Amino acid sequence: APVGLWLQLPGLDTGALVRSLFGALPGFPLVCALTQMDPMSMPRPPAGPAVRTLDYIDTARVTLAGGFDAYWEARGKNLRANLKKQRNRLERDGIATRLEIARDPAAMAQAVEDYARLEGSGWKAGAGTAVRAGDAQGRYYRAMLEAMARQDAASVYRYHFGENLVAMDLCVEDRDSIVVLKTAYDETVPASLSPALLMREEAMRSLFDGGRFARLEFYGRVMEWHTRWTEEVRTMYHVNHYRWPALRHLHALREARQRRAAGAPTDEQGS
């Protein structure tokens, strides 16, 4: 059963803390699982007689150091050439681009409405997963962004072609990092233009030049388009601490049998 947030001071032995927790929890717990751990915050422990780690997801980040020009020069030639070509086309057509960044708590309700309109115009609407400003998901994002903005820890990026809103990012922040939670773009824009990529280029320049953050994080599982912007990918993980080593062995055997029955590979990460 879920217990709650795991929070510990740096330098402490996580295994020793878990073993002490076994004695403090009610009943007779056999396994304590710490899930979705970030190796940047807590290094992945080696496997041991009563410790087993499992891969969760790969996730991506950009270290905002060294200046934008050096960063941009390190991006793929195709990305740089493609976006330059798009900007030239927009200029020939007399279409000005504009990046706006909103941080005011009072601006977050409209931001969620604008985001919902963008996402609702695309494939997510057909799949039933698009954010809607008036549903539970939309209300959650509004409340969360307003609360974070009151702590100066939220931002919304809007990108325009002329007066038309064509792409958005919803972001949260802490002292050192900005996290891109969600991205949407206008899918009615001609396929020869990539508003989300054009927005990302200008947003990256702004972040490098601003110097406020040490890194940008792409929330969630790494996607193909993330790899156009960074090579920094790390694997988040789960770690199981077992009361006895025999339990770890039995758990691994059970999962291996299930995988064989399903025809899946039986290699165990960190076994």
Map each language-model feature to its residues.
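Conserved acyl-donor/pantetheine-binding loop and adjacent beta-alpha core of acyl/acetyltransferases
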Residues: 1-5, 177
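Intrinsically disordered, low-complexity proline-rich regions
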Residues: 2, 12-13, 28, 39, ...
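Flexible, glycine/proline-enriched loop segments at strand-loop-helix junctions
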Residues: 5-11, 70-75
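Aromatic (often tryptophan-rich) hydrophobic motifs at membrane interfaces
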Residues: 9-12, 19-23, 130-251
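ATP-hydrolysis module of ASCE/P-loop NTPase motor domains
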Residues: 18-41
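A conserved beta-strand-loop-helix scaffold within acyl/acetyltransferase catalytic domains
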Residues: 36-192
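Active-site/acyl-donor-binding loops of N-acyltransferases
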Residues: 43-74, 211-271
